[in-house]
Amino acid sequence: MKRWICLSFVLGVLLGVGVVRSQQSVTGTQRIVQFENDDVKVWKSVVVPHAPLTMHRHEHGRVIIALQGGTMKIVDSQGKSEEHVWETGKAYWLPPNAPGTMHADVNAGDQPIEVMVVELKKDK
């Protein structure tokens, strides 16, 4: 319960932060850690158009908050892909990756996508 209250508070703060976007020019994909403790890790990602991220995996579920939305194409290690359309100001749940799988993310749009990611370190 305590963890969910903390997560709800963090999400509320992050949604407020999403209203004020950085005016800096983005030249490459960035991942900036915002906060980390024993329960969660929070980072901001700025994903430039058409530049695939390296293959990686997520062991735990996470919430994505779109600060600047767009369409993210997610390609798994077998070549299967799916698209996620993230609207600015909205939050989305992404479950942990299946055991033994990896994926790469590609911004399918023409503008950078900015998201805040809140990843749980313990699923239960």
Predicted regions mapped to residue ranges:
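Bacterial N-terminal signal peptides
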Residues: C6-G16
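Histidine-centered metal-chelating micro-motifs
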Residues: H50-T54, K90-D105
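Glycine- and acidic-residue-biased ligand/ion/polar-headgroup-sensing regions
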Residues: H58-Q78
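Ligand-binding loop in jelly-roll beta-barrel domains
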Residues: A98-K121
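Sec/Tat signal peptide C-region and signal peptidase I cleavage site
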Residues: G18-S22
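A short glycine-rich, His/Asp/Glu-containing loop-to-beta-strand
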Residues: G28-T54, E59-I64, V117-V118
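Positively charged n-region of N-terminal signal peptides that target proteins for export
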Residues: M1-W4
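Short acidic-glycine-tyrosine-enriched beta hairpin
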Residues: F35-D39, Q78-N97
